[in-house]
Regions:
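Histidine-rich, glycine-flanked metal-binding segment
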Residues: 2-57
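Metal-associated gating/positioning segment near the N- to mid-region
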Residues: 52-108
């Protein structure tokens, strides 16, 4: 019997620690359940990813959320949402604010 997933990302170029190549990604209950040729599997939804690269979550090691003091440029909400939309799952905040957020007292 074929496996069943909630979602299959089909035909993309998967990039991971082994390199890159055409593979499918099966997702079940919000988690990666299979990375393989899933042509015999079924899913509630299948997304054709041909011509797209599938990447693990990206870490952005230099962001400036500008909060406090410079939120007219960017704030935590807009910066975080932008990061998520770009596939970023973790950020390193660089304090470029007024006042500088470099101490526990300033962050309180």
């Amino acid at each position: 019997m074929a496996d069943t997933y909630d979602l299959i990302l089909k035909g993309g170029i998967l990039v991971n620690h082994d390199g890159e190549g055409p593979l499918d990604l099966g997702i079940r209950a919000g988690r990666f359940a299979a990375i393989d040729d899933l042509s015999r599997a079924s899913a509630g939804e299948v997304i054709d990813c041909k011509g797209l690269h599938l990447l693990p979550g990206v870490i952005d090691t230099q962001v400036h959320f500008r909060e406090p003091g410079l939120t007219h440029k960017e704030d935590l909400e807009s910066g975080s949402l932008s990061a998520v939309m770009g596939g970023v799952t973790a950020v390193f905040e660089m304090p470029n604010t007024d006042p500088l957020t470099v101490s526990a007292e300033t962050l309180a």
